[in-house]
Design a protein with these regions (language model features):
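Generic structural signal for short, flexible, solvent-exposed coil/loop and linker residues
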Residues: 6-7, 31, 56, 106, ...
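Long, low-complexity intrinsically disordered regions
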Residues: 34-95
Length: 169
């Protein structure tokens, strides 16, 4: 999974995404994004429009920053995909409502993996304290070499998949 900020250009009928990849933080189209990802999911935070607007502004201010190959969530110099989005929804001087996340150690880095966001959504839904709404999930079957829209239930179970699941189908 990757995490992105999405908006639509209604004049060109195109969706744009802010993403953090090896070349850094930049804007790409949804079509280009789909070419280099096995799975794509869209979720929305359950915040009011002003908070979402502030998060978008915060994310756009990071365009051009480097990718965080060191996996240091606490860095404000470079970012991985999940940090790019989750940091935009952390508490700041203008709001105290934020996404509640628990960072994880992976190898020598501290990160918030995208699968953890999916796991959080699954557990939050069970406890009826969701902070995120499901929008869409594009799943894939490597065996059939195809992608397809899948349901919320499959998305919420997807965090349990092995990273090698597309080889095992």
């Amino acid at each position: 999974y990757s995490q992105y900020l999405v908006w639509q250009d209604i004049i060109r009928d195109e969706y744009y995404i802010v993403e953090a990849v090896g070349t850094g933080i930049h804007i790409t189209t949804l079509a280009a994004l789909a070419l280099h990802n096995d799975y794509i999911a869209a979720v929305r935070p359950i915040f009011d429009a002003s908070k979402i607007s502030q998060a978008i502004e915060a994310t756009l201010s990071l365009l051009g920053r480097e990718y965080d190959f060191g996996l240091n969530y606490y860095s404000d110099v470079s970012y991985v995909c999940s940090a790019l989005i989750t940091k935009a929804y952390l508490p700041n001087e203008t709001w105290s409502v934020w996404l509640h996340i628990e960072l994880e150690r992976i190898a020598t880095g501290i990160v918030y993996p995208p699968n953890s966001l999916v796991r959080k959504m699954a557990y939050d839904q069970l406890s009826q304290r969701s902070e995120l709404w499901f929008v869409a999930f594009v799943d894939a079957r490597e065996k059939d070499q195809r992608s397809f829209f899948s349901c919320e239930q499959q998305f919420l179970l997807s965090w349990k998949r092995s990273r090698l699941s597309f080889f095992l189908d």
